[in-house]
Amino acid sequence: MIHHKYLNFSTAIFLLIGSFSWAQFIEVNAELDLRRISEGDRQIFITLAKDIENYFLNTQFSAITNDLEMIVDIRLVLESVSQGGSQTTINAQAIFVNKQVQPDGNLKTLDQYFYAKGIQFPYSQGRKMFYTTVFEPLVSFLNYYAFMFIATEMDTWEYMGGTSFFNRAIEISDLGKDSDWSTGWDDRWKKSRKVKSNQYLRSMRFNYFKAWDALYAEDVD
């Protein structure tokens, strides 16, 4: 099912993403809120926002969902920086929302909004991120929400099409709960299971977009 919500900017997408056409995300806008962080510590995060954007844009989270073309805004609120030996630990909150390009070129907020609290991860300036299925606090956190977005999007393309991706998010949160960085992961585990099990809402989303596509097809004809 090809939703008309993407058709208006498909040509621009092709020009923008080039060699990264296999990724699920075509635009990611990451913003850091550093107001609670001291001036001395802020320099640690010079590249973090761009690194997060590049991670989403350049990672193939699934080989079978290459044409989703999602746009996401991420706001990461850094709450504290603590030192323990040679390790720097970050505590944060985050908001993830999906967006859609309008005919006038502006971005409109869509239907997915995720608020994450209790984020904790080790970090060092300039640290690069690479996809892995092994639990890694920051990368696994980003993977979790990538799969949540993919799952909810796939539910609009195919009936219960996001189930396997909800399962991926649940698996990540299982690893997080059992790790040395378990803060917040129980909440994320509950969230992914709750959304996955809400078959009424998931079927409603699929039927809405199915009807929407049928209506658009009639308008085109």
Task: Kindly give the residue locations of the regions a language model identified.
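Sec/Tat signal peptide C-region and signal peptidase I cleavage site
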Residues: S19-A23
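Signal peptide-directed extracytoplasmic domains
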Residues: S86-S124
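Flexible, glycine-rich surface segments
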Residues: G161-D221
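Internal, conserved structured core segments that host functional sites
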Residues: D111-G176
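Bacterial N-terminal signal peptides that target proteins for export
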Residues: I2-S10
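Start-of-domain marker
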Residues: Q24-N91, Q102-D104
